[in-house]
Amino acid sequence: MKTIFRVDSRIVHGQTVNYWCRKYNVSKIIVANDELAKDDFRKLFFKIAISDEIDLEFLTIKSSINKEYDKTINCMVIFEKIDDVIKYVKEDGKINKIILSNIGYGEGKVKMSEGVFLNEKDKEKVSILQKDYGVDIVYKMMPD
């Protein structure tokens, strides 16, 4: 089976469940974010958005690297921001391809694709992921 890696600033929401999880038959979502892993209040809201058919787990970035993924299911690892992905690969996490989707507009950001806006620092980080870590970057709001 496979593991899909995504950056989504909204983390878990209707598009995640209704489109991404259905398209790739995902039965487990891991949210890799140090702050959220410790925030029980915020986690509760995300758990409400997920159907019981999908297992949702919140881990620190380091814990998500060391996590033994069930090879019999499709899993999605979601990062809230590109900084989390940089931390993941610097800690020896392996990512061949990551999908950037739902990174909102803000001051100094430019549109890279539908729903994905990056500032200069974000672009530099994407370049580091590509050049230094060999990560294939895909800009995609919705699955095909």
Regions found by a protein language model. Name each.
Residues I82-D83, E91-D144:
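Glycine-rich, aromatic-bearing surface loops/beta-hairpins
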Residues L59-N102:
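Ordered, amphipathic secondary-structure segments that act as subunit-interaction surfaces
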Residues M1-K2, N25-S27, T72-N74, G93-I95, ...:
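Short coil/turn connectors at secondary-structure junctions
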Residues F5-V7, V31, E57-L59, I98-L100, ...:
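General beta-strand structural signal in soluble alpha/beta enzymes
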Residues Y24, D34-A37, D52-I61, C75, ...:
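Extended, low-hydrophobicity, polar/charged segments
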Residues M1-I50:
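Long, hydrophobic N-terminal alpha-helical segment
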Residues K43-I48, Y88, I128-L129:
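Short, aromatic/basic amphipathic alpha-helical patches
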Residues S9-H13, L56, K121:
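Short secondary-structure boundary/capping elements
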